[in-house]
Regions:
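Ubiquitin-like/PB1-type beta-grasp interaction modules and other compact soluble beta-rich domains
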Residues: 1-139
Length: 139
């Protein structure tokens, strides 16, 4: 596996609230790709060709095109709520999409109405580019 040092902005938004990825349960799960403690909005990638599904599984947040499992509770697309994964403004259906430096990822579960989606989009962090410009890329 080749090495790299890249960063991706991440927001997991469930039922109107961002999931708090700053908790220690999410920090440093793998040396290939991880979240640093206290920086739950940034994915740190140290290997190439990391799929979104693999990264989410390392956080115990297994994801499919229609569901996300958050610590044993499965949020499934139904008549009232929808799971959407949006990368750089485009909805995707392939959870094995490879992560790319400075991607902006929204994992959304909720009613899917315009107001809620707009709120979620407004909360997507914008830090990956800033971290990439730091000495040692923030590590």
């Amino acid at each position: 596996m080749g090495s790299t040092h890249e960063h991706v902005d991440l927001l997991v938004y469930i039922n109107g609230e961002p999931l708090d990825l700053n908790q220690s349960r999410y920090a440093m799960k793998s040396s290939y790709g991880h979240i640093h403690g206290g920086e739950g909005d940034i994915m740190h990638l140290h290997a190439i060709n990391i799929p979104l599904s693999w990264f989410m599984e390392t956080l115990d947040l297994a994801i499919t095109p229609t569901s996300i499992n958050v610590h044993g509770f499965e949020y499934v697309t139904n008549d009232d709520n929808v799971l959407m994964v949006v990368i750089n403004g485009n909805a995707i259906g392939d959870m094995d999409q490879m992560l790319i430096d400075e991607d902006k990822i929204l994992i959304y579960y909720g009613p899917g109405d315009e107001d809620d989606l707009n709120r979620a989009h407004s909360l997507i962090p914008d830090r990956a580019q800033e971290i990439n410009s730091m000495p040692n890329k923030g590590d």
